[in-house]
Amino acid sequence: MAPQNLSTFCLLLLYLIGAVIAGRDFYKILGVPRSASIKDIKKAYRKLALQLHPDRNPDDPQAQEKFQDLGAAYEVLSDSEKRKQYDTYGEEGLKDGHQSSHGDIFSHFFGDFGFMFGGTPRQQDRNIPRGSDIIVDLEVTLEEVYAGNFVEVVRNKPVARQAPGKRKCNCRQEMRTTQLGPGRFQMTQEVVCDECPNVKLVNEERTLEVEIEPGVRDGMEYPFIGEGEPHVDGEPGDLRFRIKVVKHPIFERRGDDLYTNVTISLVESLVGFEMDITHLDGHKVHISRDKITRPGAKLWKKGEGLPNFDNNNIKGSLIITFDVDFPKEQLTEEAREGIKQLLKQGSVQKVYNGLQGY
């Protein structure tokens, strides 16, 4: 072998050995940078899990492998200790491996049965009995509505498990015909049951990840399929988290717009002022006024409202209403005359119907 070819072969061999030692690139699998936050990692997994689930890609022979790689990437990068080991030594540096069921990870985000991959929950078979659905109010802050978040819910879920013995199941009413003699029959109704394996209900701890999407609206529901009440002869019902946005001390939501009030002094209302309002995610909204600001005046800050739920690139407005704080102490006669001379404004007293048109 020529020296040049030998050198090329050695470099290729070293590259392949390095790739094997390094293992899979979990950041690339999830499509996130190495600086990604845990919220970014969860969001990426939730999105890709729906896209790559084998049930949604029956014609892709690599679908199962892709889904397993995705689960492995999430398992490692969502755990701070495993992520630290992975960042330092690669996949081979993980001490205890990562052998969690990727179906379990998927169910933490979507429930036991996942979704029918048309975007709608499973279709109910009328012949299969189902347990009751459970609706739980989930309180979220306006900060979470603005920026989004993942809320971890731990619950004890009753689950039907096989137990020793047999039991009667699928009981139903049937008609039995008995011949009493020539041309004489007796029809009786009786209960007929099948024999099924015995079951018992046990409580199992379940951890569910509820994604609070930016712009989520009050009353919206997030379903977790198969996480409701069990049914010993059929399927469990569903668990639905119903969003309840708690009141905020500074901002009020109206659609995608945010409303707030700012109190300024009488001097500021006359000569102008500058100030910053701290927004829901901590960034500052600057206000500068160099003109007279009347009590009740409103200022619109476009794009400083909440993100639209259907399109997060669109944001509402922040509407600021100004209140003027008048002096509490009585003015001296000298001060009154000074103000009159300064403003040079005569009386504009007028009585009118201020509610006309409402």
From Swiss-Prot:
Tissue localization of expression is:
Widely expressed.
On the tree of life, the source organism's domain of life is Eukaryota
**Position of the signal peptide:** 1-22
Q: Which UniProt keywords apply?
A: Chaperone, Disease variant, Disulfide bond, Endoplasmic reticulum, Glycoprotein, Phosphoprotein, Signal
Q: Which PROSITE patterns match?
A: DNAJ_1, DNAJ_2
Q: Pfam families annotated for this entry?
A: DnaJ, DnaJ_C
Q: Where in the cell is it found?
A: Endoplasmic reticulum lumen
What InterPro entries would the database entry show?
A: DnaJ-B11-like (IPR051736), DnaJ_C (IPR002939), DnaJ_domain (IPR001623), DnaJ_domain_CS (IPR018253), HSP40/DnaJ_pept-bd (IPR008971), J_dom_sf (IPR036869)
Q: What induces it?
A: By endoplasmic reticulum stress-inducing agents such as thapsigargin and tunicamycin.
Q: Which residues are glycosylated?
A: N261
Q: Which GO terms describe its biological process?
A: mRNA modification; negative regulation of neurogenesis; positive regulation of ATP-dependent activity; protein folding; protein maturation
Q: Which residues form the J domain?
A: 25-90
Q: Identify residues that carry Phosphothreonine.
A: T188
Record-level GO cellular component terms: endoplasmic reticulum; endoplasmic reticulum chaperone complex; endoplasmic reticulum lumen; extracellular space; membrane; nucleus; protein folding chaperone complex
State the Gene Ontology terms under molecular function: misfolded protein binding; signaling receptor binding; unfolded protein binding
Record PTM text: Contains high-mannose Endo H-sensitive carbohydrates. Cys-169, Cys-171, Cys-193 and Cys-196 form intramolecular disulfide bonds. The preferential partner for each Cys is not known.
The record's SMART domains line, in alphabetical order, gives: DnaJ
Q: What does this protein do?
A: As a co-chaperone for HSPA5 it is required for proper folding, trafficking or degradation of proteins. Binds directly to both unfolded proteins that are substrates for ERAD and nascent unfolded peptide chains, but dissociates from the HSPA5-unfolded protein complex before folding is completed. May help recruiting HSPA5 and other chaperones to the substrate. Stimulates HSPA5 ATPase activity. It is necessary for maturation and correct trafficking of PKD1.
- Assembly description: Part of a large chaperone multiprotein complex comprising DNAJB11, HSP90B1, HSPA5, HYOU, PDIA2, PDIA4, PDIA6, PPIB, SDF2L1, UGGT1 and very small amounts of ERP29, but not, or at very low levels, CALR nor CANX. Binds to denatured substrates in an ATP-independent manner. Interacts via the J domain with HSPA5 in an ATP-dependent manner.
Disease per record is:
Polycystic kidney disease 6 with or without polycystic liver disease: A form of polycystic kidney disease, a disorder characterized by progressive formation and enlargement of cysts in both kidneys, typically leading to end-stage renal disease in adult life. Cysts also occur in other organs, particularly the liver. PKD6 inheritance is autosomal dominant.
The protein's name is DnaJ homolog subfamily B member 11
Q: Which organism is it from?
A: Homo sapiens (Human)
